[in-house]
Amino acid sequence: MNYIITFGTTTAAIQCDSMIKADPINAKLVPIPGFLKAGCGFACLFQNAQKEEVKSWIGKNNISYETLIEVIYENGLISPKA
């Protein structure tokens, strides 16, 4: 499954990006998809992960985020999970 977290600030997004490098997980910072609203223009895409794994990583790394949702990620495109 694939998940996205959104951020209230660019600072939180940058912190998340730094933690991806320090505590690797299959994730990357991406421009926020058009179907989502957030305080900044970035989101973090977690690929091929379980929700509990994502939540655990977020908590362990003290990441400040707004929302966590499941998404479809195919051919480089992110769309909402129906």
Label every model-predicted segment.
Residues M1, T10, N26-F46:
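Amphipathic, hydrophobic secondary-structure cores in small proteins
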Residues T9-I25:
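Short amphipathic alpha-helix segments
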Residues Q15, G39, E53:
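Residues that form or flank phosphate/diphosphate-binding pockets in enzymes
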Residues A22-I25, L29, S56, N61:
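Preference for short coil/turn "hinge" residues that link or interrupt alpha-helices
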Residues N48-A82:
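C-terminal structural segments of small proteins and small subunits
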